[in-house]
């Protein structure tokens, strides 16, 4: 069935100091383009290398961290921006930046090829979506069997005391995956029910990680039986031979759009526009589809190996305006309640 994408017009901590800065040199006269991103670090080289095949005169300098850290850094730098482009950031974060007047509007060439719910409806557009990532639960089948744990089928199952000390999930203050989880639980269960669910989940939680991929990686390595993460990370771990089962909770799963923007005031506007144009090209979209089952290019998405077949049907009708408008309050409440178990 058609996935309902409910977009509207409208991921400066010490962790950022450790963010990886990856530069891909091309020619001595290349324009240096500083690009903030929350995309997995292992995927960045192939994107830059493919881009540079067509545009060797633009040198991408990646600054990478989790969604929450990147978002906080951008907001802190609002009056003295350091990035030219943000590429691979949550839709709710981009909407906040738009409301703060931080974006340079630009409509990339070829935008007519995209689903119109994947880009800002203003003209020119302020933000454009690339793909969507979806929450899932990674279960190490060997570990749950060894510990005598039942296989969970729902979010509510994870509140059973039998799982105490066996769960790991991302901290929503640093992780976009963690925030989409919390936002989706509040939408699915209501505000009172959502916090009650998280209170019960917290009792079973071993710890909260900095990144969204870490819980699934830890489950794959056997360091925890169960990690709340996202489906692609589980699929990649399973493809590498890990004893992982990707569980799609029966109540539904949260998800987020990943997209890109140009930062207002950049001195490298033409290079930034070139990257925007390339980022919605068929070549780029085919690369995204290698790891994401949902991409913004119309009619392109193909099944991803090891993705559960029911995943897309379980994606909730997400209220991104709710997520963007309430982000600060949600994160403050979460931190007050649960931060004692964070890395």
Predicted regions and their residues:
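Short, polar/charged alpha-helical segment
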Residues: 37-61, 75, 137
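A bilobed periplasmic-binding-protein/Venus flytrap-type ligand-binding module shared by bacterial periplasmic
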Residues: 138-143, 183-186, 256-268, 287-288
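N-terminal signal peptide c-region/cleavage motif recognized by signal peptidases
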Residues: 25-28
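A ligand-binding cleft/hinge motif common to bilobed small-molecule-binding domains
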Residues: 92-96, 220, 224-243
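Periplasmic-binding protein-like
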Residues: 113, 162-170, 197-202, 208-209, 240-264, 279-301, ...
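Extracytoplasmic ligand-binding site segments that recognize negatively charged/polar headgroups
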Residues: 38-45, 68, 82-223
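Extracellular/periplasmic bilobal clamshell ligand-binding domains
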Residues: 304-343
